[in-house]
């Protein structure tokens, strides 16, 4: 009889626990983790993806500004994150360098071998470019990258990643036979300051960078077509198609809807008007997908 009451007591306790903590019973799906790189555009796209996935009822974790390309890629392959925004040029020239992939289909097949899938292009090409102050370029009559060959004493300031990547400075120099020796690797913000002060004359920039207009820069024509297309895409783990197929479906809603002018506008709001990236993402989804999202006011503690 005593044993009977103990069993009844345990059953009642289990029912109470299940009613108080229903999530612990039903949350068998591992949480979805989204990453982004340490620059504004990647952070904004990560916010857009996060809000979009939340609209499915999932509660993804957004790990913003994790690091550079290798950090994000390795985390994706290892399963430490499930999704992050990337560019086709970075995939072919850096991540899969040496595998001889160039077309979108070749990239897609190579990624699948790593257990990774890729959406179609989101709608804008954020290629690398070389920029100069417009006034300096006009004074020297520099219109295209090959014109730099006539000015060996010009000083260049390139981002550290550009100094090392497959289509970066070493390859650019070889493609155009550029004679410049005074080339420094530095942070992008310092490069812009160098342009303003006149201590450097050319920098690498992204073609959707909001600071192009702000600093009145001239984008030099890539007349030898050195830089590949950097079409924005979303990379995600192949196992998401079985784990959470509705998440993969909603990711594809971003295909072909973020145009270059729209991305420049979003970058400008973040970098020049200091609008929080999550507010920008929320506005974009409302305007383009009629999706209302919960905007939270970011604080210093919110970034920790």
Residue spans for each PLM region:
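Ligand-binding "clamshell"
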Residues: 95-119, 199, 211-225
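Beta->alpha turn/N-cap motifs
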Residues: 65-69, 79-92, 103, 133, ...
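N-terminal hydrophobic or amphipathic helices and topogenic motifs
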Residues: 2-5, 9-61, 65-67, 263-304
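A bilobed periplasmic-binding-protein/Venus flytrap-type ligand-binding module shared by bacterial periplasmic
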Residues: 127-138, 231-244
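Soluble extramembrane regions of membrane proteins in the secretory/endomembrane system
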Residues: 176, 206-208, 236-237, 249, ...
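Bilobed "Venus flytrap"/periplasmic-binding protein-like clamshell domains
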Residues: 31-61, 123-193, 275, 279
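Extracytoplasmic
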Residues: 29, 67, 78, 113, ...
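Alpha-to-beta junction loops
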Residues: 77-86, 152-155, 171, 190, ...
């Amino acid at each position: 009889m005593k044993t009977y009451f103990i069993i009844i007591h345990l059953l009642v306790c289990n029912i109470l626990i299940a009613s108080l903590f229903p999530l612990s019973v039903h949350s068998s799906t591992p949480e979805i983790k989204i990453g982004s790189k340490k620059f504004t555009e990647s952070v904004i796209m990560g916010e857009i993806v996060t809000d979009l996935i939340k609209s499915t009822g999932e509660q993804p974790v957004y790990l913003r500004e994790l690091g550079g390309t290798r950090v994000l890629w390795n985390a994706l392959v290892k399963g430490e994150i499930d999704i992050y925004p990337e560019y086709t040029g970075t995939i072919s020239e850096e991540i899969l360098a040496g595998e001889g992939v160039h077309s979108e289909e070749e990239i897609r097949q190579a990624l699948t071998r790593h257990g990774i899938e890729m959406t179609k292009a989101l709608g804008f090409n954020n290629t690398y470019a070389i920029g100069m102050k417009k006034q300096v370029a006009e004074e020297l009559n520099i219109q295209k990258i090959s014109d730099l060959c006539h000015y060996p004493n010009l000083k260049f300031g390139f981002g550290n990643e550009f100094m090392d990547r497959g289509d970066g400075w070493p390859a650019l120099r070889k493609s155009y036979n550029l004679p410049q020796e005074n080339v420094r690797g530095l942070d992008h913000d310092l490069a812009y300051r160098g342009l303003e002060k006149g201590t450097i004359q050319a920098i690498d920039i992204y073609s959707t960078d909001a600071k192009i207009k702000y600093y009145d820069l001239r984008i030099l024509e890539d007349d030898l077509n050195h830089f590949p297309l950097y079409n924005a895409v979303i990379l995600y783990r192949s196992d998401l198609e079985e784990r959470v197929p509705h998440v993969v479906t909603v990711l594809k809603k971003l295909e072909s809807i973020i145009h270059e002018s729209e991305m420049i506008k979003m970058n400008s709001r973040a970098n020049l008007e200091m609008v929080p990236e999550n507010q920008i993402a929320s506005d974009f989804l409302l305007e383009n997908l009629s999706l209302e999202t919960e905007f939270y006011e970011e604080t210093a503690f919110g970034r920790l």
